Design a protein with these regions (language model features):
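Polar/acidic, low-complexity leader/linker segments enriched in S/T/G and N/D
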Residues: 1-24
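Oligomerization/assembly interface segments of phage tail-like spikes and tubes
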Residues: 25, 36-55, 182-202
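Short amphipathic beta-strand starts and helix->beta connectors
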Residues: 27-36, 136-138
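Exposed beta-strand and adjacent loop surfaces of beta-rich binding modules
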Residues: 46, 128-132, 160
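Short, conserved charged micro-motifs
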Residues: 56-62
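Small/polar beta-strand repeat architecture
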Residues: 155-174
Length: 202
């Protein structure tokens, strides 16, 4: 298994920077017009962590976490504090936040996702105990696989019924370097160079 179901400790993530990137291929024609296309259906997130760490204990904790992941070898969960809810960052998740499917009278399994305008982002790493589901706005019983983001309802929703969910989630990432660097500035403090993370598909 190339993914460890463990989250980077929050104290090591505070002060991180980053965001989503897209890959766009642009060809400029002889006429001056452009032809643009993208091989990616989903954006990919990148982050920098560790640059604000000064405590030797925190630096040691990040080093230990890095070693346990074998550098770039194993993925892990990362809490992006700017985007980790099914609702707005300042809100509280509700079961009607995100539409995750339409019932057909037979199907009971649905995959969590979050809408960004017309773009749907698959949510593969929901937080255990945070997922709520609803059918046509009414709360329903559901089981959740927190390793895949698959929701299984106790009963199949009727045809055309709207299935929705609310949740917290982590972003699956890996280290994007096989090396981290730190310097000792006093007996009990130091400085760590920023460590890159990159979102992975799971």
């Amino acid at each position: 298994m190339s993914f460890h179901e463990v989250r980077l400790p929050a104290r090591l993530a505070f002060g991180s920077s980053g965001g989503v990137e897209r890959r766009t291929e642009v060809v400029t024609l002889a006429s001056g017009y452009e032809r643009r296309s993208s091989p990616w259906t989903q954006g990919r997130r990148r982050y920098l962590i560790g640059a604000n760490l000064r405590s030797l204990d925190d630096m040691a904790a990040l080093t230990a976490f890095f070693e346990a992941r074998r550098g770039r070898l194993y993925g892990f969960r990362f809490r992006d504090f700017a985007d980790f809810k099914s609702c707005a960052p300042s809100g509280t998740p509700e079961a009607t936040d995100q539409v995750i499917g339409i019932g057909d009278g037979v199907r009971r399994t649905f995959e969590l996702s979050k809408a960004y305008g017309e773009v749907l982002r698959p949510i593969r790493k929901p937080v255990e105990g945070s997922v709520m589901a609803a059918v046509n706005g009414l709360a329903v019983e559901a089981a959740v696989d927190v390793a895949t983001g698959v929701v299984t309802l106790a009963a199949a929703p009727a045809k055309e019924a709207v299935v929705s969910a609310g949740f917290l989630f982590d972003t699956p990432v890996r280290f994007d370097a096989d090396r981290i660097e730190a310097s000792l500035e006093s007996f009990d403090a130091g400085r760590m160079a920023a460590v890159p993370l990159i979102e992975i598909r799971v």
